[in-house]
């Protein structure tokens, strides 16, 4: 009888810990939403909240026009664990902070360890935006042997034209596979569809109409109103259209 009670208490403790962790992860997701990170779309897997799906859209610099899929893997005890989250891109990317063998992103220069309550996932994504916007600045002050891909760093510093050409190859390759069949049945996996006028046309028109009305609504927003809307991908391109 005592053994049964101890087992029940242990099960209850595990359940409570799991529920608390789920709430903390949900809070992280809500913070990402509130930050309105332009060019980064991410969502936890329905099957496992420790695994997230994501897409990065480059908006400026050498990586502008890029569309890179990535996975975000959280440690088992996140966010209480000091271990860092893992970002793994689904394609080869030439960048000083991306491992050429595993496609994993090195975030240790910004986050030596994960500090619960101080470090948040939206900050990680902000860092991702920054290092792709200005890769040269991202390696400034870092010793070459501490960089995940020193060959990429050396090429960036000594032959920027060649570096840019190889990055363009990465971008082209990623776009060629953007419509590939999804590798998982998880309904939260981010899927791209080719533009279909009968399906997506009405949505695009609503977006255009909303943008035309933005000027008229500016005064209302200043007085406390908010504007919301839909996002989509422009026909023939990979730029997200959005009303925020």
Curated annotation (Swiss-Prot):
Residues 20-176 form the UBC core domain. Pfam families: UQ_con. Gene3D superfamilies: Ubiquitin Conjugating Enzyme. SUPFAM superfamilies: UBC-like. It comes from the Eukaryota. Coiled coil: none annotated. Belongs to the ubiquitin-conjugating enzyme family. FTS subfamily. This is Protein crossbronx. It comes from Drosophila persimilis. The gene is cbx.
């Amino acid at each position: 009888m005592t053994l049964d009670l101890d087992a029940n208490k242990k099960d209850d403790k595990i359940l409570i810990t799991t529920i608390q962790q789920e709430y903390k992860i949900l809070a992280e997701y809500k913070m990402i939403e509130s930050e309105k990170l332009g060019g980064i779309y991410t969502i936890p897997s329905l099957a496992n909240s420790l695994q997230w799906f994501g897409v990065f859209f480059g908006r400026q610099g050498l990586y502008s026009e890029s569309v890179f899929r990535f996975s975000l893997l959280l440690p088992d005890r996140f966010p209480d664990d000091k271990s860092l989250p893992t970002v793994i891109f689904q394609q080869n990317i030439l960048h000083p902070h991306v491992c050429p063998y595993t496609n994993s992103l090195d975030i240790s220069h910004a986050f030596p360890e994960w500090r619960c309550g101080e470090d948040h996932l939206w900050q990680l994504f902000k860092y991702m935006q920054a290092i792709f916007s200005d890769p040269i600045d991202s390696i400034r002050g870092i010793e070459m042997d501490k960089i995940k891909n020193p060959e990429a760093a050396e090429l960036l510093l000594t032959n920027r034209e060649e570096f840019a050409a190889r990055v363009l190859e990465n971008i082209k390759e990623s776009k060629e596979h953007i419509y590939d069949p999804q590798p998982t049945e998880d309904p939260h996996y981010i899927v791209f569809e080719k533009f279909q006028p009968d399906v997506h046309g009405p949505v695009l028109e609503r977006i255009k109409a909303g943008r035309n009305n933005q000027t008229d609504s500016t005064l209302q927003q200043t007085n406390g109103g908010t504007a919301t809307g839909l996002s989509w991908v422009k026909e023939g391109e990979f730029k997200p259209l959005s009303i925020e």
